[in-house]
């Protein structure tokens, strides 16, 4: 009998019941909640006269709708100008109070993007099953956890039963072998992976990311990679537990303490795929082939290295791809442009659940230090992923570096990742964004999003257009 993959181990250890139709009942260790997908779930509990099965297994924080300017944040919920956003945040506060669920509200320094808060609090732990009404819950797979997004009705189901009906995915291994080049980050790695396998390449799979190129990443970097597994079509992204994982978790508020810590670490050592484990699909990418990446179109798979020409629709042999490229060219306003450096940027956004952790901000600050934002740029904002990230960055003086360069230093939240708060693109505006999606209208109606790493976004803010950060930092 062959060994088990990490995904198999996590699945089997949480299997409550296997059903004849191929579905299974899976136990859920942690549910993260935010203001957008939880109101209907709580209302469902209320109408049915139910209580949460285990309140200690849920953690909430508002993130999608919260304003990020200091002026608006001083008043807490009352500072939210949009009435719908205000209702959603207020409703989360009320629901958490009524049902006894821990919430880091807008006035709590621990508030932030749910996928930043869970790990930094140690609420996300190796070996767990983690769900949230948000597709980027795959982020938590960086800890050797089985994590994925769920719908609102499923949010209610988990609140009521602490279980979920699921169908098991197949196993895919994406191995990044070798050593990454200077200034090539986790964001470049995952964009290159999506470019290679496509946005449907991981459909039906749980992707385990491995190889020396992945193992060399910090936990912040690993979270970036797993965060975008969903953009490759996979609900689940996983990375095996190692010393890097354990060191990150150690001492965090929700992490085990004392003898429980020692017992946990011993158990976590098995959270790796067995050497003889069989994967349904294996993809191998050479780390040294990965260069700084930039998306040019309206899908994460429309991505190229900074030094490559923008692909043209007329050069595509596949008629479906040709049509998609033509639409993307028109939407993105690329006529007359051949290289990414030809695109004049309007705004730069450094933040989101993909790239708003302290490591991301340190890298961006390193690039902009002693420089000034391009005069052609309308706006450049830096939005930390949580109040604790913000406090740490300010302790290190990173906010002073950003502000001296002309970037705005904001309060924590999802911000310009999506057009659900005051931070948006105008129609026809181009952004260099460290977020995870570049669909039509994602950052605002008619907005044109280019996904990049924090280093590339920082360099673009100074240059006013896309440049290779490797060349940029030399001058």
UniProtKB/Swiss-Prot annotation:
UniProt pathway: Amino-acid biosynthesis; L-leucine biosynthesis; L-leucine from 3-methyl-2-oxobutanoate: step 2/4
Binding site for [4Fe-4S] cluster: 353, 414, 417
Keywords: 4Fe-4S, Amino-acid biosynthesis, Branched-chain amino acid biosynthesis, Iron, Iron-sulfur, Leucine biosynthesis, Lyase, Metal-binding
Cofactor: [4Fe-4S] cluster
Keyword Amino-acid biosynthesis: yes
Catalyses which reaction(s): (2R,3S)-3-isopropylmalate = (2S)-2-isopropylmalate
EC number, UniProt record: 4.2.1.33
Keyword match Metal-binding: yes
InterPro entries, A to Z: 3-IsopropMal_deHydase_lsu, Acnase/IPM_dHydase_lsu_aba_1/3, Acoase/IPM_deHydtase_lsu_aba, Aconitase_4Fe-4S_BS, Aconitase_4Fe-4S_dom, IPM_dehydratase_rel_enz, IPMI_cat
GO molecular function: 3-isopropylmalate dehydratase activity; 4 iron, 4 sulfur cluster binding; metal ion binding
Co-factor note (free text): Binds 1 [4Fe-4S] cluster per subunit.
Pfam families from the UniProt entry: Aconitase
GO biological process, one term: L-leucine biosynthetic process
Known role: Catalyzes the isomerization between 2-isopropylmalate and 3-isopropylmalate, via the formation of 2-isopropylmaleate.
HAMAP family per UniProt: LeuC_type1
Protein family membership: Belongs to the aconitase/IPM isomerase family. LeuC type 1 subfamily.
Subunit structure comment from the entry: Heterodimer of LeuC and LeuD.
Name under which the protein is recorded: 3-isopropylmalate dehydratase large subunit
Species the sequence originates in: Marinomonas sp. (strain MWYL1)
């Amino acid at each position: 009998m062959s060994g088990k993959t990490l995904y198999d181990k996590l699945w089997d250890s949480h299997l409550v019941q296997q059903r004849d139709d191929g579905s299974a009942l899976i136990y859920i260790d942690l549910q993260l909640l935010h203001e957008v997908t939880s109101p209907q779930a709580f209302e469902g509990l209320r109408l049915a006269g139910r209580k949460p099965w285990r309140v200690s297994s849920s953690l909430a924080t508002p993130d999608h709708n919260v304003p990020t300017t200091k002026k608006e944040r001083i008043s807490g919920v009352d500072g939210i100008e949009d009435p719908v956003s205000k209702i959603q945040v207020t409703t989360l506060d009320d629901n958490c109070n009524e049902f006894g669920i821990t919430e880091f509200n807008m006035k709590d320094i621990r508030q932030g993007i749910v996928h930043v808060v869970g790990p930094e609090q140690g609420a996300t732990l190796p070996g767990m099953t983690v769900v949230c009404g948000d597709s980027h819950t795959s982020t938590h797979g960086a800890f050797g956890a089985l994590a994925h997004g769920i719908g609102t009705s499923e949010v209610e189901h988990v609140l009521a039963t602490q279980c979920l009906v699921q169908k098991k995915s197949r196993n895919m291994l994406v191995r990044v072998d070798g050593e990454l080049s200077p200034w090539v980050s986790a964001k470049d790695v995952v964009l290159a992976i999506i470019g290679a396998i496509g946005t449907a390449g991981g459909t039906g799979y749980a992707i385990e990311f491995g190889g020396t190129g992945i193992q060399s990443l910090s936990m912040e970097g690993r979270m970036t990679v797993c965060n975008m597994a969903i953009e490759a079509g996979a609900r689940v992204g996983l990375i095996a537990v190692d010393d890097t994982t354990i060191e990150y978790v150690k001492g965090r508020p929700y992490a085990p303490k004392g003898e429980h810590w020692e017992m946990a670490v011993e158990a976590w050592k098995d959270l790796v795929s067995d050497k003889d484990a069989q994967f349904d699909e294996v993809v191998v990418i050479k780390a040294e082939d990965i260069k700084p990446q930039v998306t040019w179109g309206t899908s994460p798979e429309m991505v190229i290295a900074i030094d490559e020409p923008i692909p043209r629709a007329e050069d595509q042999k596949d008629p479906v791809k040709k049509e998609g490229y033509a639409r993307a060219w028109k939407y993105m306003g690329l006529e007359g442009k051949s290289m990414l450096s030809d695109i004049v940027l309007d705004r730069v956004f450094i933040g989101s659940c993909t790239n708003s952790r302290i490591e991301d901000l340190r890298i961006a600050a390193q690039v902009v230090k002693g420089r000034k934002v391009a005069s052609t740029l309308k706006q450049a904002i830096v939005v930390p992923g949580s109040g604790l990230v913000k406090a740490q960055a300010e302790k290190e003086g990173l906010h002073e570096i950003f502000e001296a360069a002309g970037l705005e230093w904001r309060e924590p939240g999802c911000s310009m990742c999506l057009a659900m708060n005051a931070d948006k693109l105008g129609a026809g505006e181009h952004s260099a964004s460290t977020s995870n999606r570049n669909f039509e209208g994602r950052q605002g109606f008619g907005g044109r999003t280019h996904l990049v790493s924090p280093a590339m976004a920082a360099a673009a803010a100074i240059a006013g257009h896309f440049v290779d950060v490797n060349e940029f930092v030399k001058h």
